[in-house]
């Protein structure tokens, strides 16, 4: 029992393998046959195109050379040679010349051979029309496009009114005449033949019109865009220059017209003015150089002169006189009055609320030296402390002198006005 079942399974496996191999062989054979057919078709088409192009080129070249060899008034021997060569080229041209229905399709120009052996140049429109006329599918198949458009065109097409248009292609085109003779009425009727042909011509004209419109539109867009770019650049430059001109008009600087007042005083006074607000810099190292400028801020003087014209007072005092003033503390008020009497006024510099004192060092006190070397900052500060060592009573008397000098200055201003 087991042996019988095993033999049955072996037979089934063998039949399955045979059927699978048969199917695989059949599919491979069919695909190979299809591939071979495609290859044959491509090779035939390639060979036909090459032969057609070569024949047309040889025919055109032979025709041109044959025409150039025809020379009037030549000698007998030369004429015989040229005639023999011309005949040889004529044979080549007749052998390789294609039929009038065959053309060389180019992008713009088509070279067509005529029955007389010459060639004519066709543009793209004429080449398409010639291809349409020589194609049997134009008359046998239904027109391309929607049937509604074809029916609408047929509504306005009348064969009786188109007799002249129908007779013209029969006379001028040998390909249409040959196809008309073969196909009418065996394949198509007379009306269908001409309806399909003229509708295809109508579609070709519409396509050419659309192409011309696209070319014109592209040319117009190119010409119209160039001036716009220039106008945009001009507008941008003008917009960039306008704010700059406005800023130049607004930014006009007027010269200063505020009168100023200079007061120079070389008197022996003004050493005790505002000790609390005095900022004294160290004197110069050489006895003949001019010391840095000392600035003294006087708030009371600023308040008194706020309602009047501001002025700048420059007082020149030597250090020897300042040292002498430290010993003479008995009459600061009288000395201040004398100094105010010697003040001179000049209108030159811009206004200021500070009094600037310029100290000229005439003595060697500010430049102590150690073995011919420059003195240190501590020695200079000690000398200044000795020169300006004052008691509290002397400071109060100096402040009272400043107040009195302010009153005298006000009187001088009134007299000056």
UniProtKB/Swiss-Prot annotation:
Bias-annotated ranges (Polar residues): 332-343, 360-379
Gene3D superfamilies in UniProt: BSD domain (1.10.3970.10)
Matches recorded under InterPro entries: BSD_dom, BSD_dom_sf, BSD_domain-containing
Chain residue ranges for the region called Disordered: 215-234, 262-292, 323-390
Bias-annotated ranges (Basic and acidic residues): 262-278, 345-356
TM helices/strands, residue ranges: none
Comp. bias (Acidic residues): 380-390
SUPFAM superfamilies in the record: BSD domain-like
Superkingdom per UniProt: Eukaryota
Bias kind Low complexity: ranges: 281-292
GO cellular component, one term: cytoplasm
Protein's name in the database: BSD domain-containing protein 1-B
Biological source species: Xenopus laevis (African clawed frog)
Lineage of producing organism: Eukaryota, Metazoa, Chordata, Craniata, Vertebrata
Designated gene of the protein: bsdc1-b
């Amino acid at each position: 029992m087991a042996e019988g079942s095993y033999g049955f399974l072996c037979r089934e496996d063998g039949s399955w393998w045979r059927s699978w191999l048969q199917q695989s062989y059949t599919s491979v054979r069919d695909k190979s046959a299809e591939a071979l057919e495609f290859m044959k078709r491509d090779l035939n088409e390639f060979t036909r195109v090459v032969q057609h192009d070569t024949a047309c080129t040889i025919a055109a070249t032979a025709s041109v050379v044959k025409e150039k060899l025809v020379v009037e008034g030549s000698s007998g021997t030369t004429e015989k040679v040229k005639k023999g060569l011309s005949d040889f080229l004529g044979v080549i041209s007749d052998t390789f010349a294609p039929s009038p229905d065959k053309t060389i399709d180019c992008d713009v120009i088509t070279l067509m051979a005529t029955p007389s052996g010459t060639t004519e140049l066709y543009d793209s429109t004429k080449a398409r029309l010639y291809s349409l006329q020589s194609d049997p599918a134009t008359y046998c198949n239904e027109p391309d496009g929607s049937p509604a458009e074809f029916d609408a065109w047929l509504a306005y097409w009348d064969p009786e009114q188109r007799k002249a248009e129908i007779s013209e292609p029969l006379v001028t085109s040998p390909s249409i005449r040959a196809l008309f003779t073969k196909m009418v009425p065996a394949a198509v009727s007379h009306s269908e033949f001409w309806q399909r042909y003229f509708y295809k011509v109508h579609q070709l004209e519409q396509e050419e019109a659309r192409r011309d419109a696209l070319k014109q539109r592209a040319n117009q867009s190119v010409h119209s865009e160039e001036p716009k770019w220039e106008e945009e650049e001009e507008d941008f430059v003008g917009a960039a220059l306008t704010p700059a001109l406005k800023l130049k008009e607004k930014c006009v600087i007027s010269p200063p017209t505020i009168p100023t007042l200079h007061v120079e005083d070389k008197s022996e006074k003004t050493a005790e003015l505002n000790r609390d607000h005095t900022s004294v810099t160290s004197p110069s190292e050489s006895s003949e150089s001019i010391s840095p400028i000392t600035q003294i801020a006087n708030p009371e003087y600023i308040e008194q002169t706020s309602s009047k014209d501001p002025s700048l007072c420059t007082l020149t005092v030597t250090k020897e006189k300042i040292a002498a003033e430290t010993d003479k503390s008995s009459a600061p008020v009288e000395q201040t009055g004398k100094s105010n009497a010697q003040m001179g006024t000049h209108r030159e510099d811009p206004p200021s609320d500070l009094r600037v004192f310029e100290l000229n060092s005439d003595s060697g006190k500010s430049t102590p030296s150690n073995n011919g070397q420059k003195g240190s900052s501590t020695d200079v500060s000690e000398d200044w402390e000795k020169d300006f060592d004052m008691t509290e009573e002397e400071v109060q008397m100096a402040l009272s002198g400043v107040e009195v000098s302010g009153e005298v200055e006000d009187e001088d201003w009134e007299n000056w006005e």
